[in-house]
A protein has these predicted regions:
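Conserved glycine-rich SAM-binding loop
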Residues: 188
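Short secondary-structure junctions and interdomain/linker hinges
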Residues: 1-3, 218
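Short glycine/threonine-rich loop-to-helix capping motif typified by GTGT followed
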Residues: 155-161, 192-208
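Alpha-helix-loop-beta-strand connector modules within alpha/beta enzyme cores
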Residues: 92, 166-172, 205-218
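Active-site-proximal beta-alpha core segment in soluble small-molecule metabolic enzymes
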Residues: 3-182, 191
Length: 218
């Protein structure tokens, strides 16, 4: 099964959000304010994922209060912080691990978020190094992983590479005792800026077909 989550940072006009909600689309948030906008627009909290770097304590607290689907954690330190704030609230919070898959998205390095030298996400090796600490945290429940490899991706084989890497990561985490319920995959399909008239809308169908064929989880 799959579900599309709209990146609310693109446009959070209430009228647009009402239309999106009617089609059963979920919401991907990058800030506490975006979580609030989604809640106020009437989205089911369990259709909201909170990703994004630099989350502030008060933003995390709000997401915890709203019982959203998951908070995507960017670092070992953020996992620990979410656990601490969840304990303060007397809750067990669902999280997803943002894993850095070390994949070259064949895009501008400034918008590349998935290679080893990127500041985004947690390397698989770092997860293994901290596995005992992660498992000892009592107020988080790891239910998913989050992969985002970059923006303006024009070479479709990159998405196949991403799926293959995700399959290995999920298999390994499952062997370590984690129950991975979902995989949140991201990476912006590129716009043909050179000849936009030849491709006014990106080839989403091909990307979805690749993910359906190669992603072996769920």
């Amino acid at each position: 099964d799959y579900k599309i989550h709209y990146a609310i940072k693109a446009n959070y006009d209430t009228r647009l959000l009402q239309i999106i909600r009617k089609y059963g689309v979920g919401i991907d948030c990058a800030s506490g304010n975006e979580v609030r906008c989604a809640i106020e627009a009437g989205f089911d909290p369990k259709s909201i994922v909170y990703a994004g770097v630099g989350k502030r304590d008060k933003e995390i607290r709000y997401a915890i209060e709203q019982n959203i689907l998951a908070i995507n954690c960017e670092s070992i330190e953020e996992i620990d912080l979410v656990n601490e704030l969840a304990a303060e609230a007397g809750k067990v919070v669902n999280i997803a691990l943002r894993v850095n898959p070390d994949i070259d998205p064949k895009t501008n390095h400034c918008i590349d978020t998935g290679q080893a030298d990127s500041k985004f996400g947690i390397s698989y090796e770092e997860i293994i190094e901290n596995i005992d600490t992660i498992k000892s945290l009592e107020n988080i429940n790891i239910i998913g992983i989050h992969i985002h490899i970059g923006s303006q991706i024009r070479e479709l084989h990159v998405f196949e590479n991403m799926c293959n890497k995700v399959n290995v990561i999920v298999e390994n985490l499952t062997k370590l005792g984690f129950e991975i319920e979902f995989v949140d995959v991201g990476g912006g399909l590129g716009i043909n800026y050179d000849m936009p008239e030849n491709e006014p809308i990106p080839n989403f169908a091909s990307v979805f077909a690749i993910i359906k064929q190669h992603l072996k989880v769920g």
